[in-house]
Each structure stands twice: as C-alpha cells, then as structure tokens.
C-alpha cells in the first residue's frame, strides 16, 4: 500500500495501577498482540502525538486513524491532511474525517486477541453490526482493493492463518483451535 509508518500510538505505553495477583498495569486489550506483530512504539517511528503534530504541520498527505479520537486537534489535522477514519463511535475525530468508514465494535465481529501473558484467545461475534458498520478487517480489505491491491485474505480464519505462518509467536495455531 506504500505505507511508510505504522504506529499503534502512545496509548500502548499508558499504564495504570497493578497488584501482585490479578490486576495488570497494562490496561490496553491486545497490546501483547501488537508487540508480537512489531507494532509497539519503537525508535525511528513517530509516536502518537508526533504523528498528529506532523499532520498538523502538513508533513503527512494521508492519515489513517483506526478508533483514535483526535479531539481538539481534529480540525487542524483535517485542514492539512486527508484523514481516513475507521471508527465504531461518533466523536470529534470521526466527524472531522475526510472519509469515514463505520467499524463494527468488538462484539460484532470474529477474531482473536493475545492477553498480557501471551495466551491467544478467540473472540466470537455476539451481535450483528449496526446499520452499515463492517468488521475492521473487511474495511481494511476494501481500502486495500480501492487502492489497487489484492487483499491477502477474506476472513478471520484466513487472516489468522497468515499470522500463524509469518509471526513466530502464533506458529502452529489456528483460529478454530483457539479457546474462548
């Protein structure tokens, strides 16, 4: 797709309080999965706020936001960059997007997540998506195809198979073989 930077944002660094038994300091679901995929904040990649500042300065032509609310920066960013927003909820950042793609919430799509201990668990769709909302993976496929690229997979099972083939932490796993 010609993407030069992928950033999951500074939220991955946001930590809360923890105990020695059950409560983890990391309050982000699936941050371990992001780390396994190499998407954790790292040297040479703009952090969340730095990406926003670069967009406000006109240094980014396109900004793809998945679920991130730009808040007070939304209008300034939208004035300088094409903002493609993939969001499940209405907020200032979503409404300021040049192109807004309605994303289903987690309960409206199949998939998996990796907990802080590395256990990969399956998530099953519990509800049908509202209105024209689509699962995030479907929106990503449509976006890739609209840019002239063939989507590498068409279902959560196929996506997970690709993940298992390319990421050592998921080798030998299959979506159907995961526990809930």
Stretches with model-predicted labels:
Residues 1-176:
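Non-catalytic alpha/beta scaffold blocks inside enzyme catalytic domains
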């Amino acid at each position: 797709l010609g993407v030069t930077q992928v950033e999951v944002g500074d939220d991955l660094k946001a930590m809360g309080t923890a105990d020695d038994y059950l409560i983890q300091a990391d309050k982000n679901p699936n941050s371990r999965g992001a780390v396994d995929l190499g998407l954790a904040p790292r040297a040479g990649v703009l952090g969340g706020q730095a990406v926003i500042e670069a967009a406000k300065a006109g240094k980014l032509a396109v900004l793809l936001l998945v679920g991130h609310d730009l808040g007070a920066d939304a209008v300034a960013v939208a004035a300088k960059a094409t903002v493609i927003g993939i969001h499940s909820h209405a907020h200032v950042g979503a409404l300021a997007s040049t192109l807004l793609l309605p994303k289903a919430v987690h309960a409206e799509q199949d998939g998996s997540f990796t907990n802080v201990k590395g256990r990969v668990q399956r998530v099953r769709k519990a509800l049908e998506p509202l209105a024209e909302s689509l699962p995030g993976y479907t929106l990503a496929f449509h976006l890739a195809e609209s840019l002239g690229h063939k989507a590498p997979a068409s279902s959560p099972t196929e996506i997970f198979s690709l993940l298992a083939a390319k990421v050592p932490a998921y080798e030998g796993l299959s979506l159907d073989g995961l526990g809930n």
